[in-house]
């Protein structure tokens, strides 16, 4: 009995090793789970469900195959794939969730989020995030030609990379006050999120009670998976195929 959490895979055509690692994970490891939660940034960017990119079809098929094996799949949008829509979700067998959302994890209320909404010190990013949440702007963008959408996405991606180089690590991380406030708002003591690419389990005290924040890692150099079972949360590392064709993985108990 286990539930799996992943995020920040950032799939793109330039990194077939990451695609192979995810597909292998979906085929070999995930079928034994009760459920799989993908907490955003599954793709490096997403310009619409109508994008004919073969990578998208392959990933949708891999998730659909997992769903057919009885594993429930849930998805929270990230800042890279916030335009991923119901068409792709339906084909993949995914259920789309709001950000944040509360789930029942083996009898415990657990708060899930991609995590970017907690980086409150990054004022420029939070302003951009509010703009990208505008429904009318999304509607307009999705009606542009695919080539135009791709050009805009590539430009924004490049600008983001340049800006992040100049930002301090503190600004790009979540703020403790935002974490505390969100947990209080939803009546939870456990938060699971991604976005920052800093996998760790943080134990702290919230209003006199033990609390925990679990951060998922990215899949740039190795896969990061959170395995939860009744009474236990464990972060695991999965080796990418190009580094270890045998498909071994290492576990870190934190």
Swiss-Prot record:
Q: Give the location in the cell.
A: Cell inner membrane
User: What domain of life does the UniProt record list for this protein's source?
Assistant: Bacteria
- Could you list this entry's UniProt keywords, alphabetically sorted: Cell inner membrane, Cell membrane, Hydrolase, Lipid A biosynthesis, Lipid biosynthesis, Lipid metabolism, Manganese, Membrane, Metal-binding
- Cofactor binding note from Swiss-Prot or TrEMBL: Binds 2 Mn(2+) ions per subunit in a binuclear metal center.
In the record, biological process GO terms are: lipid A biosynthetic process
State which residue ranges cross the membrane: none
Q: Which Gene3D superfamilies match?
A: 3.60.21.10
Q: Which family does it belong to?
A: Belongs to the LpxH family.
What is the role of the protein in this entry? Answer: Hydrolyzes the pyrophosphate bond of UDP-2,3-diacylglucosamine to yield 2,3-diacylglucosamine 1-phosphate (lipid X) and UMP by catalyzing the attack of water at the alpha-P atom. Involved in the biosynthesis of lipid A, a phosphorylated glycolipid that anchors the lipopolysaccharide to the outer membrane of the cell.
- Official protein name in the record: UDP-2,3-diacylglucosamine hydrolase
Q: Give the organism, scientific name.
A: Aeromonas salmonicida (strain A449)
Gene, per the UniProt record: lpxH
